[in-house]
Amino acid sequence: FVSGCRNHCPGCFNPETWDFDYGEPFTDETEEELIKALRPSWIQGLSILGGDPMEPENQSALLPLLRRVREELPGKDVWLYTGYRLESVSSSPLLDLADVVVDGPFIETEKDISLAFRGSRNQRIIDLRGEGQWKTQ
């Protein structure tokens, strides 16, 4: 989880992460722990949520981590969860390092616990490595 989110979605499952100062600082030691935890073959990849990884303050810390994941662990997938629509963050360099984005704000009136990988029906699962097609499930 990253800390810091300006969306403040009503009904958010993790509102404590809205605060940019919540939690522990991301250090070189934290990065080493993450890389080590991702190495086993039974670990498919890394999911980054929060807070919101697309907040500018979070992107600067995540870029080096995701570059390292791509270089050292090329078979692992990377999922980013953001309350922003993909169209509004499409220039983010994080997208070049991600495989899948789950986008859109959580909308409590569209909450559906039967959905895979997302909390409300308005959110999309977008396969960035597929043939340019967005998939929603």
Ranges and model annotations:
Residues 1-28:
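Canonical Radical SAM [4Fe-4S] cluster-binding loop centered on the CxxxCxxC motif
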Residues 8, 42-44, 74, 97:
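Short loop/turn motifs at secondary-structure junctions
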Residues 19-33, 55-95, 100:
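Canonical radical SAM enzyme core domain
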Residues 33-53:
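Short Fe-S-cluster ligation motifs
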Residues 47, 99-102:
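Residues embedded in well-ordered beta-strands within globular domains across many folds
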Residues 51, 83-85, 106:
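Active-site beta-loop-alpha junctions enriched in small/polar residues
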Residues 56-62, 67-70, 111-137:
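P-loop/Walker A phosphate-binding loop and immediately adjacent motor/lid segment at beta-alpha junctions
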